[in-house]
Amino acid sequence: MIKQVEKNAKQKMEKVLEATKHDLNTVRTGRARPSLVENIMVDYYGTQTPIQQMAKVVAPEARQLVIEPWDKSVIESIEKAILKSNLGLNPSNDGNVIRINIPQLTEERRKELVKVAHEKAEKGRIAIRNIRREANDELKEMEKNSEISEDNYHRGLDMIQELTDTYIDKIDKMLEDKEQDIMEV
């Protein structure tokens, strides 16, 4: 029974880790990466749709992104969505594709982006801790209902804490890598 609680917690923590990784990938660095804009939502005939589902996004150069929509009529909608995304990007379109030149980041902007990355990582840590709390509550309930012994309860708490520490360390490592990426000139 404890193994099941641990397994459930691990699955949930894995999902949080993936979501945090995805969130951190949306934080801009000095290089052009398709992931920077792929998940920006665009109003596509009344439906919010991510850019990646309506266009091909490539980085032909280190500081340039090219977005080639499959339906040319949405070019202006994509352009507006990018401008509204607060990423500090200035798209330009030639009627067929949207080109985005990624400007060099200033020191001040880098520090702002590091703060944003810290906030996203902290959200991930909080989610991991909430999963730990849920698992601990589940174990406490099992012990209260005499489904597990007190020793097994404490063993379970220790396992969940180890799991929590492992996943928080993974998030910290991702944050550290992202920070280095952002601060790299």
UniProtKB/Swiss-Prot annotation:
Keywords: Cytoplasm, Protein biosynthesis. GO terms for cellular component: cytoplasm. One of its GO terms (molecular function) is ribosomal large subunit binding. It is found in: Cytoplasm. InterPro entries: Ribosome_recyc_fac, Ribosome_recyc_fac_dom, RRF_sf. Gene3D superfamilies: 3.30.1360.40, Ribosome-recycling factor. Its main location: cytoplasm. GO terms for biological process: translational termination. Responsible for the release of ribosomes from messenger RNA at the termination of protein biosynthesis. May increase the efficiency of translation by recycling ribosomes from one round of translation to another. HAMAP family: RRF. Belongs to the RRF family. This is Ribosome-recycling factor.
